[in-house]
Amino acid sequence: LKPKDLEEIPFSLLIKDCSVSFMNHKRTCVQLAVDIAKTMVANFGKEIKVDMDIMISGAILIDVGKLLEYEIVDGKLGTSDYGKIVRHPFSGVAIAARFGLPPGVQHIIGTHSKEGDLGKRTVESIIVHHADFVSFEPFKA
């Protein structure tokens, strides 16, 4: 995939005829996460702590593994051979670790999708998980 592809490819292959781009979904997810976190801090004050830097970084990068999971062949977007056996939360964590990103960011990347349902999520990961699904699930309805 090339940078320009991200404004054109659908954000998910799980939604038939999805016309929402990868980058549009990404911007929406980040904005939702920030809005949720700010609202929670405004209403709950000291009762909740959100590391905004970690949360925003994680929200931006949750789908970085899709750059390995997806490929364009003959002008058509599909799942790469790699992506057929390694989903984007796993490859995304590997990319983040390779570049020395903090464990909190890696955690958000690894737990933002269904793979995170079996373990513990940090506050930041919970917020990003829900922001991601709010900007995903309605397109499956």
Set out the residue ranges of the language-model regions.
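Aromatic- and histidine-enriched alpha-helix N-cap/loop-to-helix transition segments
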Residues: 24-28, 87, 122
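Acidic/His-rich, divalent-metal-binding segments that scaffold phosphate/diphosphate chemistry
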Residues: 1-78
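Histidine/acidic-rich helix-loop-helix segments that form or flank divalent-metal centers
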Residues: 44-46, 50, 55-56, 93-97, ...
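Histidine-centered active-site/metal-ligand motif
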Residues: 25, 62, 88, 112-113
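Short, surface-exposed linear patches
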Residues: 39, 81-83, 130-133
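Divalent-cation-assisted or electrostatically stabilized phosphate/pyrophosphate-binding catalytic cores
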Residues: 76-98, 126
